[in-house]
Amino acid sequence: MIIFQIFKLVMENSWVDFLFGPYLAYSNAQIIIECTAVFFGIASVLYSRINNILVYPTGLISTALYVYLLWQFELLGDMLINAYYFIMSIYGWYYWTRKHNGQIAHPVTRTLPKERQQAFFLFFATLFLIALVYTFFDKWNGITALVDTFTTGLFFVGMWLMARRKIEHWLCWIVGNIISIPLYFYKGLTLSSLQYAIFTVLAILGYWQWKKHYLSKEVIA
């Protein structure tokens, strides 16, 4: 109960109580799982920003933990996001490491018109799928489920584009992360809400870094 006692001690500050009060009702296991998932989630985005393959093993750990945690908090859309992330991380890991004549087979590029069409199809197909999931489990509770469904669509597209090393995947992350900050805070997952605030900053930096990298290669070519 050490973690519970630590949270209880810092509750003397009203702002701390406002931010972290819900954690008093959580088990030690839930707090440890969320902290670990947040740590590896941030590490994964940092590696993604610098176009490093370690984005995938760190991401696999974070997403696996979040699947379990989000099921408990009935955020079914985000739970499916992380299950999808897990699968796409395996695909991305393979895709990024492929080489042709000793060179990286799939460098950073922009999305093509056909890929944009595929992205739109994936987005709307995801909205339909997540709406069905919420309805099937009788968890459609208004605005929270609606927002969760929308961000799920953005993140599905973002992960697919990232696995294919497309610059525009960062734009999906930026919008989705901004929306997720109040969503997770409302659900009482303050650490995850703060994580998405950090993700937003990293996504903006990542977008400019990938764009700069792409333009430098284009000039050389």
Predicted regions and their residues:
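Short, strongly hydrophobic alpha-helical membrane anchors
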Residues: 1-31
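Hydrophobic, membrane-inserted alpha-helices
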Residues: 37-44, 61-67, 153-158, 174-182
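Hydrophobic core of alpha-helical transmembrane segments in multi-pass integral membrane proteins
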Residues: 41, 116-136, 200-203
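Membrane-helix interface "capping/anchor" motifs
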Residues: 46-57, 160-172
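Loop-to-transmembrane alpha-helix initiation sites
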Residues: 78-81, 188-199
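Membrane-water interface of transmembrane alpha-helices
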Residues: 84-102, 211
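Juxtamembrane helix-capping/reentrant segments at transmembrane boundaries
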Residues: 104-121
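Alpha-helical transmembrane segments in multipass membrane proteins, preferentially the mid-helix core
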Residues: 131-142, 149-167
